[in-house]
Design a protein with these regions (language model features):
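N-terminal Rossmann-like NAD(P)+-binding domain of SDR-like oxidoreductases, especially those catalyzing
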Residues: 1-170
């Protein structure tokens, strides 16, 4: 198993579904984890300010629960918009992580395809900024993607050797 004791890890998109679960697991394994999230996409800001949605109360409950779990685990949450290079760079330079994990993205294929500009802005812009910050800090970089990049595939699993055939911008 990888030794994480004493490693400082920044999770960009760390308050999302995968991000908060990863943060909790890494912290349990001894890493010093920092969640970096704007709380704008697939998150508190998006749902609390949205129009009436039948699932709004449920989504808000999930989001509040994520934030509570991060707080209880004493994982710092840096509310930072990773689309702004200067703000993200300042945050990460102050933090000095050993590893940066990029999780920030529009997490719903239908929403992503309906608003490609926002998807590009929240997914690729944050990726570009995170990569540049990692290079400057000489930090390891891990990028989380989605099985959606492989398109429709047969079977239960797909390997990284499979050719990418994305069906949309997501």
């Amino acid at each position: 198993m990888i030794e994480l004791q004493g490693r400082k890890i920044a999770l960009i998109g760390g308050a999302g579904f995968i991000g908060h679960n990863l943060a909790l697991t890494l912290a349990e394994m001894g890493a010093e984890v920092h969640a970096v999230d704007s709380l704008q996409v697939n998150n508190l800001g998006a749902f609390s300010n949205s129009h009436e949605d039948a699932n709004k109360a449920l989504y808000l409950h999930f989001i509040h629960d994520r934030l509570r779990l991060l707080q209880e685990a004493q994982i710092p949450l840096h509310v930072v918009d990773a689309r702004d290079y200067h703000v993200l760079s300042r945050c990460l330079n102050d933090m000095k992580p050993d590893t940066i994990v990029q999780l920030a993205a529009i997490a719903h294929a239908n929403r992503a395809n309906k608003d490609p500009y926002s998807t590009f802005d929240h997914s690729l812009r944050t990726l570009e900024n995170a990569l540049d910050c990692a290079r400057g800090l000489k930090a390891r970089f891990i990028y989380f993607s989605s099985s959606m990049v492989y398109g429709n595939f047969d079977g239960e699993a797909v390997t990284e050797e499979r050719h990418c055939e994305p069906l949309g911008i997501y």
